[in-house]
Amino acid sequence: MASAQDLRKRIKSVTNTQQITKAMKMVASARLRRAQAKADATRPYAEKIGQILRHISTSDLRDYVSPLLESRPVKRTCYIVIGADKGLAGAYSSNVLKLAIEQIGQKTPDEYCLITAGRKPKDSLKSRHYHIDQSYSGFSDKPSYEHARHIMDHALSLYERHEVDEVIMIYTRFVNSMTQIAQAECILPLEQPDDEVKGEEYEFMPDPASVLDA
């Protein structure tokens, strides 16, 4: 039977662990609130930009043809897989990984290329012998516009050089703190949804090429 001293040490150890766990929970909650606030602040802007680009795709571009609007037979697909740098994130990275594997299916490296953001998707896909064209990591805690721009510039260059025929981003769509959904979204070429208003006229300053290629 444990002595009274052993019991006191055990109680103290459990109490200390509870305090540490509580502190970790408070830090995680604060970081989640900050991340959610940033996501909520940028979402209307991103949605509006997407809507404008889709409208532009059916407007009069004065004979200018942007590679962003060029639709062609899909022989090779670029997948951008976005996950975390570290673990302890529940199913955040594993759900994205599962969806990425489903999307790639039985494709050979001649039929796909992979760009990963985050160490977890990179390591997981590499361990499964998928060829990774380019990887980025070290910024999942504090992603910035510049980080996103570097990734997109690489994917765009592949698309413009006809090395890939479409670009699909696989990421986690944040709904609320309890619900996050792994999602695959085609971002190139730009597509016009059936419910969008077609044929709107836009004034381009200085010209369509400068606007669409910015």
Predicted regions and their residues:
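C-terminal beta-strand-loop-alpha-helix "lid" module of Rossmann-like NAD(P)-dependent dehydrogenases
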Residues: 1-214
